[in-house]
C-alpha cells in the first residue's frame, strides 16, 4: 500500500493512476479511472470524527467513489478550479483532501474541459471527461457513475480548497443507517452569515433528516428571543447509487428553480436527505476576495505542517 499525497495514511495503490492503468472510456475518451476496491472501517478514521457527534460504524463493505465536478467556465470567477492557491491548482487541493480521508476507493475529477483534464493528468489525478450539457454537478456525477461502479458516490465541490479529510467521516457514518439514501453536511452558521443569501441555511428533523434548505433566514425568530441555532449547509453530498440515478433523472422542481438550490429537488420528490455535522466551515471560492482568503489559510496550513 502506498500513501496518498499529503496523507500519512495508507491508500489504495490505484488511488492515483500509473502507467499500467488500463483506464475506462468516458465521453468517448480513454481516461485513467481506478477500479473500485473493497474497503471497510479504518481505526484511524474513527479518531477524526467531529466532536463525537457521529460514530463511524462498520458499514459492512462498500464500494465508495468520490467525484469532483470541475467546470472551467465559471460565471462568477473565471477559470477558478485552475486558479493557483499556495502553489497548487484549486481542484488539486480538493482532490488531496478527499483522497487523504482514506474512505473512498477512488476520487475522480469530472470535467468537460480538456484543459482541466490535462492539468489533472500532469498531476496524476484521475479524470473523466463528461458532457458539456450537464446542467448540474450531480448530473456530472451520474455520468461518471455509469462508467465507474460503486455503491456510494460522493459529490465533492471543486471550488472548496480549504476542505480537509475530517469532513468525510461524519458524512459517511450516516450510511451505517440503512434508511439513509442521501446525505450532506451542515455547520453552525456564523452570525455575519445568517442573513447572507449566499450562505444557504438548513433546518432538520430530530433524526437529522432535512426539512428545508433556503437562502432566507430559517427558522425565523419571531419573538426575537436570540435564537442561535442557525445551520449553514455545506455542498458536499453522498448518494447510494439508486438514489443518485433517481435524483438525476428527475426534472428541476418548482422550489429548486425559485431558490436555485438543486437539493430541493430531492425534498420535493420525497427523497430523504440526512444532514451530519461538519467539523468546521469551508470557503467556497466565488470571488477574488475568497481566493485571497483561501490562499492565506492554505499557506498557514503548509507552514504549520512543515513546522
How should each PLM-predicted stretch be described?
Residues 3-11:
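Residue-level detector of structural "landmarks"
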Residues 163-253:
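Conserved core of the sugar-phosphate nucleotidyltransferase
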Residues 228-305:
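Conserved alpha/beta core of the MobA/IspD/sugar-nucleotide pyrophosphorylase nucleotidyltransferase superfamily
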Residues 108, 114-173:
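Short phosphate-binding loop-to-helix
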Residues 11, 29-31, 42:
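Low-complexity, intrinsically disordered or signal/transmembrane-proximal segments
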Residues 55, 61-110:
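N-terminal glycine-rich phosphate-binding loop and ensuing alpha1 helix
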Residues 21, 25, 32-34, 47:
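Short terminal hydrophobic/aromatic SLiMs and anchors at protein ends
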Amino acid at each position: 500500500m502506498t500513501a496518498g499525497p499529503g496523507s500519512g495514511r495508507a491508500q489504495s495503490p490505484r488511488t492515483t493512476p500509473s502507467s499500467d492503468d488500463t483506464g475506462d472510456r468516458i465521453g468517448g475518451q480513454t481516461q485513467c479511472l481506478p477500479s473500485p476496491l473493497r474497503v471497510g472501517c479504518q481505526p484511524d478514521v474513527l479518531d477524526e470524527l467531529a466532536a463525537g457527534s457521529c460514530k463511524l460504524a462498520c458499514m459492512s463493505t462498500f464500494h465508495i467513489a468520490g467525484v469532483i465536478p470541475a467546470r472551467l467556465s465559471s460565471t462568477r470567477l473565471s477559470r477558478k478550479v485552475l486558479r493557483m492557491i499556495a502553489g497548487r491548482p484549486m481542484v488539486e487541493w480538493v482532490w488531496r483532501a478527499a483522497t487523504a480521508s482514506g474512505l473512498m476507493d477512488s476520487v475522480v475529477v469530472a470535467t468537460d474541459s480538456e484543459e482541466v483534464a490535462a492539468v489533472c493528468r500532469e498531476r496524476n489525478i484521475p479524470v473523466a471527461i463528461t458532457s458539456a450539457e450537464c446542467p448540474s454537478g450531480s448530473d456530472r456525477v451520474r455520468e461518471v457513475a455509469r462508467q465507474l461502479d460503486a455503491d456510494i458516490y460522493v459529490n465533492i465541490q471543486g471550488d472548496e480548497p480549504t476542505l480537509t479529510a475530517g469532513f468525510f467521516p461524519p458524512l459517511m457514518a450516516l450510511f451505517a443507517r440503512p434508511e439513509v439514501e442521501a446525505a450532506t453536511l451542515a455547520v453552525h452558521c456564523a452570525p455575519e452569515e445568517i442573513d447572507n443569501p449566499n450562505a444557504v441555511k438548513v433546518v432538520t428533523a430530530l433524526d437529522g433528516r432535512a426539512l428545508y434548505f433556503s437562502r432566507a433566514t430559517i427558522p425565523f425568530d419571531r419573538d426575537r428571543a436570540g435564537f442561535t441555532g442557525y445551520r449553514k449547509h455545506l455542498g458536499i453530498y453522498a448518494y447510494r447509487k439508486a438514489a443518485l440515478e433517481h435524483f438525476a433523472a428527475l426534472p428541476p422542481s418548482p422550489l429548486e428553480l425559485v431558490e436555485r438550490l438543486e437539493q430541493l429537488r430531492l425534498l420535493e420528490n420525497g427523497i430523504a436527505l440526512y444532514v451530519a455535522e461538519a467539523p468546521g466551515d469551508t470557503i467556497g471560492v466565488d470571488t477574488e476576495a475568497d481566493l485571497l482568503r483561501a490562499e492565506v489559510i492554505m499557506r498557514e496550513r503548509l507552514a504549520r505542517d512543515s513546522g
